Each structure stands twice: as C-alpha cells, then as structure tokens.
A protein has these predicted regions:
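Extended, aromatic/histidine-rich regions of cofactor-dependent oxidoreductases associated
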Residues: 73-77, 145-150, 156-161, 167-169, ...
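A short, sequence-level motif marking secondary-structure junctions
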Residues: 23-34, 51-55, 130-138, 156-157
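Forkhead-associated
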Residues: 1-32
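Solvent-exposed beta-strand/loop surfaces of large extracellular or lumenal domains
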Residues: 19-29, 142-155
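Surface-exposed beta-loop interaction hotspot
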Residues: 43-110
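Short, isolated positions in well-ordered beta-strands
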Residues: 22, 46-47, 125-129
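Mid-length scaffold segments of soluble, non-membrane domains
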Residues: 108-151
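Phosphate/adenylate-binding glycine loop and adjacent helical scaffold
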Residues: 21, 39, 43
Length: 207
C-alpha cells in the first residue's frame, strides 16, 4: 500500500496536499516514500509525515513560532582541513543490524541496517564506525571529546556517500547539529559505542 496518512478536510478549510486543496480525503505520503508529500495548512504552517518502524505521524512547522522568531543562529568551528579524512568503505551484502538508542526511548535500542563497514585512522589508531542508510546517503551519528563541552552534548550528525573506488570521505567540517538540539519534540538517535570518539573533533557545527 501507500505509505503515510489520510487527511480529511472541507474545501473551506483551505488545506493543501501537494499543491491541491483538499475537499474530502487526500493521502499524505510519508518520508519513506520516493516522493513524500507536503501539507500546507496556512501561509506559515506546513507539515510532512514522518515514518518509523511502519508507524506514521504528522510533523508540523510554524514559521511564526516563538522558537523560530527568537532563534539566535548556529555557532560553528572554523574550517579545518585536518578534519577531512579519507576512510575505507567495505559493503556488507544484505547489511547488518546495529542497535541505536534514541534520546527518549529510555535505553531501548532500535535496530538500523548498516550497509557497510567504514574504517579510518586517526593519530595512528584505527577506528571502525557504523553509519545507517538515510535516503540515498549514509548517516553517521557520533560524539567526541567536544560533546557537552564546546559542542552539543548529545552528539552530531554527518552525512556520507561512498566513492566508486572503495574510499569514503569523512569531512567533519560538514558535521551538523541533530534536530533535538533545536526542539525537545525530536527523538534523535544516539551514537553507538563505536561512534563515540575519545578525541576532540573541532570542526562543523557546535551549538
């Protein structure tokens, strides 16, 4: 079947799904669909359907919200070529399951499919890390010695793509804050043990 939720509305309500005003019912395709839908409730309120383990929920955004109006910006480390690292990508046929705890799940791990092994070296030490699929990219959830000090305590995200030659570039200058850094409504994945680095990665977004 089609992923997502059903919206029921009268024409007078002015709710639009994928640009079409709803008069009766409309399917709002989830983020797990190749072509996810967008819902427009008003000039400032929009939404989309998030998916998790076969369950769906409507996430709503209001550009007039107090949090957005008072948003002060994002601090980041200066660009550092030191933190552009070339690693090795080894595909795992069929992938493997790795448990990721989430911020609000009270220690319960959710299995994510990790499609390959990423290895790299830093200061003579080899590391093997786990990144799960996120659309067409790989998502690395990591923490380091800056976490809870000069960067966000929960950790940060880095999106990756393997190169055709079997290498993978980890440019930590592109590390970003997770959604839960901006709102308690988000239930972010936490770094598994192998993604908790003992060194400080002074690159990317901080807080």
């Amino acid at each position: 079947g089609v992923s997502g939720l059903i919206v029921r509305a009268d024409l007078s309500e002015g709710i639009r799904v994928d640009g079409v005003t709803v008069d009766g019912e409309a399917t709002v395709r989830g983020k797990d669909d190749d072509s996810p839908s967008t819902v427009v409730f008003s000039d400032t309120v929009t939404g989309h359907v998030i998916a998790s383990d076969g369950s769906y929920a409507l996430r709503v955004w209001d550009s007039n919200s107090e949090g957005i109006q008072n948003f002060g910006g994002i601090d980041a480390f200066p660009y550092s070529p030191e933190w552009v690292i070339t690693g090795t990508w080894t595909e795992i046929p069929g992938g493997k399951s790795v448990g990721f705890e989430h911020l609000k799940d009270e220690g319960v791990a959710r299995d994510e499919v990790v499609p390959g092994e990423i290895t790299f070296s830093h200061e003579g030490v080899d590391y093997s890390i786990a990144a799960f699929k996120a659309g067409r990219a790989l998502q690395l959830v990591f923490s380091d010695a800056t976490s809870g000090d000069s960067s966000y305590s929960v950790g940060r995200f880095l999106f990756l793509a393997p190169n055709p030659d079997g290498t993978i570039t980890l440019d930590f200058n592109y590390a970003i804050l997770p959604p839960c850094a901006f709102s308690y409504a988000f239930n972010c994945p936490l770094p598994p043990a192998q993604n908790r680095f003992p060194f400080a990665i002074e690159a990317g977004e901080k807080n």
